[in-house]
Amino acid sequence: MKVRSSVKKMCDNCKVVRRHGRVLVICSNVKHKQRQG
């Protein structure tokens, strides 16, 4: 899980999701997991 000020899709499988007021990127590739913070 990377914590970034700007979360971007890193590949076609990445999805940008909002959960509990946080912006997350979920992906089948574990290295692409990000959250905004």
From Swiss-Prot:
<comment type="similarity">
    <text>Belongs to the bacterial ribosomal protein bL36 family.</text>
</comment>
<dbReference type="Pfam" id="PF00444">
    <property type="entry name" value="Ribosomal_L36"/>
</dbReference>
<dbReference type="GO" id="GO:0005840">
    <property type="term" value="C:ribosome"/>
</dbReference>
<keyword id="KW-0689">Ribosomal protein</keyword>
<feature type="binding site">
    <location>
        <position position="32"/>
    </location>
    <ligand>
        <name>Zn(2+)</name>
    </ligand>
</feature>
<keyword id="KW-0699">rRNA-binding</keyword>
<protein>
    <recommendedName>
        <fullName>Large ribosomal subunit protein bL36</fullName>
    </recommendedName>
</protein>
<keyword id="KW-0694">RNA-binding</keyword>
<comment type="subunit">
    <text>Part of the 50S ribosomal subunit.</text>
</comment>
<feature type="binding site">
    <location>
        <position position="14"/>
    </location>
    <ligand>
        <name>Zn(2+)</name>
    </ligand>
</feature>
<comment type="function">
    <text>Binds the 23S rRNA.</text>
</comment>
<dbReference type="InterPro" id="IPR000473">
    <property type="entry name" value="Ribosomal_bL36"/>
</dbReference>
<dbReference type="GO" id="GO:0006412">
    <property type="term" value="P:translation"/>
</dbReference>
<dbReference type="GO" id="GO:1990904">
    <property type="term" value="C:ribonucleoprotein complex"/>
</dbReference>
<dbReference type="InterPro" id="IPR035977">
    <property type="entry name" value="Ribosomal_bL36_sp"/>
</dbReference>
<dbReference type="GO" id="GO:0046872">
    <property type="term" value="F:metal ion binding"/>
</dbReference>
<keyword id="KW-0479">Metal-binding</keyword>
<dbReference type="GO" id="GO:0003735">
    <property type="term" value="F:structural constituent of ribosome"/>
</dbReference>
<feature type="binding site">
    <location>
        <position position="27"/>
    </location>
    <ligand>
        <name>Zn(2+)</name>
    </ligand>
</feature>
<dbReference type="GO" id="GO:0005737">
    <property type="term" value="C:cytoplasm"/>
</dbReference>
<dbReference type="GO" id="GO:0019843">
    <property type="term" value="F:rRNA binding"/>
</dbReference>
<keyword id="KW-0862">Zinc</keyword>
<feature type="binding site">
    <location>
        <position position="11"/>
    </location>
    <ligand>
        <name>Zn(2+)</name>
    </ligand>
</feature>
<keyword id="KW-0687">Ribonucleoprotein</keyword>
